[in-house]
């Protein structure tokens, strides 16, 4: 992945190989094309997992893998569940209008930057409030098509860029993408 792509995903490790979903899909397409040309079956193991994305199977990468896997003589193997006991993912149900649910993220001393995705199934819409470890509250941000809202927390010195995308192009769902910089340790609440 390029530096710009890594920055957009709030990834500051540049000393390890990283790939965009598009690079992985191009590699998959190439391998399958060569197998077809040689008239051979093919099994492709693609061990490139991600915490990002809707995880519904409706994204472009997932749909492409499903389409390739449906072809005779083609098997695509991907890893799943590698972080099942690490509280990396969460989900919840908001029963009715006005209900409030908290997503709590415990940030450690060494965690300085963090990308956060909150997915909302279509056609539902939500407002987002953020509570810092010191109790500072940013109230009821909401989608206005696609926007970037820059937030600065006074006591923590943390900066967040909140982007609402509705509908997100590959799934049709709503995506709230938060890029958090200079995080302070403690429990951050997203409600």
Positions of the model-derived regions?
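Short acidic, glycine-rich surface-loop motifs adjacent to enzyme active sites
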Residues: 8-10, 26-56, 79-80
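Stable alpha-helical elements in mature extracytoplasmic
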Residues: 24-27, 61
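Substrate-binding/specificity loop regions of serine endopeptidase catalytic domains
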Residues: 49-191
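Subtilisin-like serine protease catalytic core
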Residues: 1-22, 39-40, 57, 71-73, ...
């Amino acid at each position: 992945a390029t530096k710009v792509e890594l920055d957009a995903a709030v990834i500051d490790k540049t000393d390890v190989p990283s790939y965009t979903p598009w690079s992985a899909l191009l590699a998959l397409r190439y391998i399958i094309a060569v197998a077809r040309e040689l008239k051979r079956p093919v099994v492709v193991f693609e061990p490139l997992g991600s915490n990002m994305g809707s995880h519904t199977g409706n994204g472009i990468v997932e749909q492409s893998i499903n389409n390739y896997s449906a072809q005779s003589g083609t098997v695509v193997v991907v890893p799943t569940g590698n972080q099942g006991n690490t509280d990396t993912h969460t989900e919840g149900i908001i029963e009715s209008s006005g209900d409030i649910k908290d997503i709590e993220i415990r940030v450690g001393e060494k965690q300085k930057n963090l990308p956060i995705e909150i997915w909302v199934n279509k056609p539902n819409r939500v407002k987002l409030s953020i509570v810092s470890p010191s109790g500072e509250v940013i109230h009821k941000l909401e989608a206005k098509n696609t926007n970037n809202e820059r937030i600065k927390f006074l006591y923590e010195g943390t900066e967040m860029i909140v982007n609402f995308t509705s509908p997100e192009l590959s799934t049709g769902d709503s995506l709230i993408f938060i890029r958090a910089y200079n995080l302070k340790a403690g429990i951050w609440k997203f409600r």
